[in-house]
Amino acid sequence: MLLQTIPSFERIGDYATNLEELGEKLATEGGSFSEKAKQELEILTTAVREILDTTIQALSENDSELVKTIEPLEEVIDDMVRLLKDRHTKRLKNGSCSVTSGLIFIDALTHLERASDHCSSIAVLMLARDNAEILANHYDYVRHLHEGTDKHYASELRRRREQYVDQLYKL
């Protein structure tokens, strides 16, 4: 199972490199983000740091309970990215953000979201190790979770939305 996680960790590293390059591009081109965009990005990066830390901890400690907290957080990160892309598109349309900075912001959101997607993949691999049904069809497992019929998942999802998405709405 550990070998199966290597490609996901490699991709996460690639996204980190891409984010660094976006930061360099923003600096070289003299671009900047609005204060609101910076605040939004800070909330999102906090969530992504948490999912990365949780994934590493769950894997290193072989913690099957901790691993179950990853998918709800990943779904919340997806929700946050959708919201932030919509907000940023409005800023672009009303001229409060330059095209260059706006595209960099959107690219950064995409890289952060994809890193969290790989954390979800690692979590599913960990759960599949002890569950033949998940191993046989992990897509059905994730779809079932997203349908909201798992009480633990629904509770964790609600908690994570309160923790992160609510902060975005307060901005």
Task: Describe the function of each predicted region.
Residues 1-171:
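Cytosolic, long alpha-helical scaffolding segments
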